[in-house]
Amino acid sequence: MTLFRLALKGLTALVLALAPQFAAAEDEAPPSEAVTLGFIENIVVGNLGMKMTAKLDTGADTSSVHAYNVKVYQRGERDNWVKFRLIGKDGRAIRYDQNVIRFAQIKTKSGGLIRRPVIRLPLCVGGQWGRAEINLADRGDFEYEILIGREFLANRVLVDSGRTFIAAEECEQPDED
């Protein structure tokens, strides 16, 4: 086999090997509707318009909020529900009583596991409304009471980790839950 044919075969193999990576990169391009926001932003939680300051964290799968007086109980034979309170930036507290959609197992720094209830709540950041799966946690030791993870951010928000409070759009109240 000539050197030219050997080089051509090698080049063909390289192109075929890289083709799926280029195709995958095209599939992962952000949608044109995604808005760029800072890693810290003001958000609106729930339909009652509670304002909180959130950390937008692309390293977290799901969102987490500092909830007070969390009490899980059963309604019926198998339905888990949870009562809790959230406190906004203005000090206003809102009580919730919601269906638990699942329980998350969270690893602690010491290597143990904590079981947290996960609920769905409407959130808005930078004018982008959506429902987020949020685990109820004790975030008292953290600077921000709510952390927004990839599950909510995907296809809505691009996070600029070097900037804060850059949202241009305000969050108008939703018409429904």
Task: Show which residues each predicted segment covers.
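Bacterial N-terminal signal peptides
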Residues: 9-19
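Bacterial N-terminal signal peptides that target proteins for export
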Residues: 1-11
